[in-house]
Amino acid sequence: MQDCIICGGAQETNLYSVASFDGIQSFSIREDNPAKASRPFDRDRDGLVPGGGAATVIIESYEHAVKRGAPILAEIVSWGFSGNGDHISTPNVAGPARSLELCLNKGGISPQQIGYINAHATSTRIGD
């Protein structure tokens, strides 16, 4: 087992990725107000705003972090995965719900102990 790992990824925005989202009519039409255009889980949502991005996360074992005196900002106590076989743009509720259930059971924690969930949302009725 590794003491420390670096995880990262990036997505570029290009003609083909934009065209694929345009083809399924998933863009917001609120281009006159970009700051309020993307509204994940909002009742009045009407689509996403395209963009690229990148992120890197450095994860290390608890023991390794303590040994080097690092401030503990968060702890991964469990994880869950469920491939429901649906398309990324039209997920069903059963797959993500099963993932959360597996995570809670494996970690021995209750939903009330969760302080933050980072969700993937498209600001579309079918994707949210």
Kindly label every feature range from the protein language model.
Residues 2-3, 115:
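Short acidic/polar active-site loop segments enriched in Thr and Asp
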Residues 32-109, 113-116:
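Condensing-enzyme catalytic core mediating Claisen C-C bond formation in acyl metabolism
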Residues 3-46, 79-93, 121-126:
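Acyl-CoA/ACP chain-elongation machinery
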